[in-house]
From Swiss-Prot:
Main location (coarse class): mitochondrion
Protein name, UniProt field: Small ribosomal subunit protein uS7m
GO cellular component, one term: mitochondrial small ribosomal subunit
Molecular function, one GO term: rRNA binding
Length: 148
């Protein structure tokens, strides 16, 4: 991680932390580096590809459940920058795990394929973002209930 700027280092650190289970950081770090060292089909830097993929998946708005007079409404709201990045990474990893279960291939290949799909604005992580934006636009008439 020598020639990376602060944002890229933070993104890789978040990726490792989200993927880590039972405190096995070195194992997860090796998987992440194998993912990044896979031969890319593009000529771009793989870390830059990951940053752009996360940018394509970041949600702008989300919905929160608010109870008013005994009725629960889905109220749309703006997502903070850190939460945008967190949700994007989480969705990419969830999609990679689902792809791994359905196709029975290595996690490195699944992660790289999902990052490539996110970069090209397709895949299940992008679909999840579009579904969330659709839900927020459907419920935008309840935006006046937002008081947080």
């Amino acid at each position: 991680m020598g020639g990376l700027d602060g944002e890229q280092k933070l993104l890789i650190k978040k990726l490792v932390n989200f993927r880590m289970k039972e405190g096995k950081r070195t194992r997860v770090r090796a998987i992440v580096y194998q993912t990044f060292h896979r031969p890319a089909r593009t000529e771009r830097d793989v870390i830059k590809l990951m940053v752009d993929a996360v940018e394509n998946i970041k949600p702008i708005c989300e919905v929160a459940k608010v109870g008013v007079a005994g009725t629960i409404y889905d109220v749309p709201g703006i997502v903070a920058r850190d939460r945008q990045q967190t949700l994007a990474i989480r969705w990419i990893l969830e999609a990679a795990f689902k792809r791994r279960i359905s196709y029975r291939i290595s996690l490195e290949k699944c992660s790289f394929a999902e990052i490539l799909d996110a970069y090209q604005k397709r895949g299940s992580a992008r679909r999840k973002r579009e579904n969330l934006h659709g839900l927020a636009s459907t419920n935008r008439s309840f935006a006046h209930f937002r008081w947080w």
